[in-house]
Design a protein with these regions (language model features):
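Short amphipathic alpha-helical segments and their helix-coil junctions
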Residues: 1-13, 166, 174-180, 243-251
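A non-catalytic, helix-rich entry segment at domain boundaries
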Residues: 28-135
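Mg2+/Mn2+-dependent nuclease catalytic core
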Residues: 123-242
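Charged, glycine-rich intrinsically disordered N-terminal tails and low-complexity linkers that flank
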Residues: 1-59, 296, 311-342
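A residue-level signal for conserved active-site and pocket-lining positions in enzyme catalytic cores
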Residues: 25-26, 155, 213, 267
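Metal-dependent nuclease catalytic regions and adjoining charged, substrate-binding loops involved
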Residues: 60, 186-189, 198-342
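Hydrophobic (often cysteine-bearing) scaffold residues that line and stabilize catalytic clefts
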Residues: 17, 21, 25, 92, ...
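Short coil/turn segments at secondary-structure boundaries
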Residues: 6-9, 113-123, 257-262
């Protein structure tokens, strides 16, 4: 249901503080990689779109700390919706900086971009899979084409001999939120995100024949690396096909309480559609009139409950047509890997 409300209807809320702190940490690490790549190209300065000029050859810890402070100032002004008891505090800055240093110092800088041959920092990919199985057509939305993959990769390094390594930084939990299971070395091999990165990297960097995909859980376990070769591409495409068909053929999205009842508390604490109602929007909010529902009788339904109710009443096509956020268009995305359209 969360996928449907966010990416089909465009109903997205503000980020939580933990996620926003992760964004800040990512940005600090991104700048170190951008500086290293620029230094490899003989450039002394980069002009970052968020914090301005940064020298590429200054590796002093104090300088990186100052970069972190500039990043933190920029994003806390951007993420100014954390107020009251949840307002930004000195401890938050200390967390962001310590997380970045933790990633950089691991095993004497094994994953420090400044000690690597950087191929790309934050490269974007956006392409269609031009296969028959990837076709879609929705005449009611004037929408047709092929499944498109779009995203952003944190870091790509050249290890030599046709081997590239992708590093994806994670500041959150080492957990698959879809299944509730913890990631480990065994189940990461078929991780959809890493598989998608491999598929994209073969397009971006055809000169490489082998890719190491490292997902680095900074605070919950460290780096985990899986190895993909050209021979894995067929299985990767099959995983993408099954996921695409599952989404395409869904008439009634599943909800967390039905999938994992013990995790249903997350609906009202972590999910925007579960925490908010349609009050104050262009959609008329509904009162709960059915006994035994998650929303108490007589209270305003959450967005999730109302969407689910209307799907049962009118069907998913009707809800998609009438509940889509103003200005939102299915199939359009913003400039970043995790953004819905700007």
């Amino acid at each position: 249901m969360q996928f449907y409300t966010e990416y089909t209807l465009g109903l997205r809320g503000l980020g939580g503080k933990k996620a926003d702190k992760g964004t800040i940490t990512h940005k600090i690490l991104e700048i170190t990689a951008l500086c290293k790549k620029a230094a490899q190209e003989g450039k002394a300065v980069i002009d970052d779109e968020d914090i301005g000029e940064v020298f590429t050859d200054n590796y002093e810890p104090e300088y990186l700390n100052s970069i972190g402070a500039r990043v933190y100032e920029h994003y806390t002004q951007l993420f100014n919706y954390h107020t009251g008891k949840n307002a930004w505090r000195d401890r938050d800055f200390e967390d962001c900086l310590s997380w970045a240093w933790k990633a950089l110092k691991y095993k004497d800088g094994m994953y420090d971009p400044r000690q690597r041959d950087v191929v790309d920092a934050e490269p974007h990919f956006d392409f269609e899979i031009e296969e028959d199985w990837a076709k879609y057509e929705y005449p009611e939305y004037n929408l047709s084409g092929h499944l498109a993959l779009k995203g952003t990769i944190d870091l790509v390094s050249d290890l030599g001999d046709g081997v590239y390594e992708v590093v994806d930084w994670k500041t959150g939990m080492r957990k698959d939120w879809a299944s509730g299971k913890e990631y480990n070395q065994n189940n990461l091999f078929n991780n959809p995100q890493l598989r998608m990165y491999h598929y994209a990297c073969k397009r971006l960097y055809p000169e490489a024949h082998t890719f190491l995909m490292t997902i680095y859980f900074i605070n919950t376990g460290g780096p985990f690396t899986v190895h993909y070769q050209d021979s894995d591409m067929k299985q990767t495409e099959e995983i993408l096909r099954k996921r695409f068909e599952e989404i395409r053929d869904t008439d009634e999205p599943q909800i967390l309480p039905r999938i994992r009842p013990k995790d249903c508390w997350k609906c009202r604490t972590m999910c925007h559609a579960g925490k908010t109602t349609f009050e104050g929007t262009n959609i008329e909010p509904l009162k709960e009139h059915r006994p035994g529902q998650r929303t108490k009788y007589g209270e305003t339904m959450s967005k999730c409950e109302q969407v689910r109710y209307m799907i049962k009443l009118k069907g998913i096509d009707w809800v998609t047509k009438h509940y889509m956020a103003p200005g939102y268009t299915v199939g359009k995305y913003g400039s970043g890997g995790g953004k819905v359209q700007d």
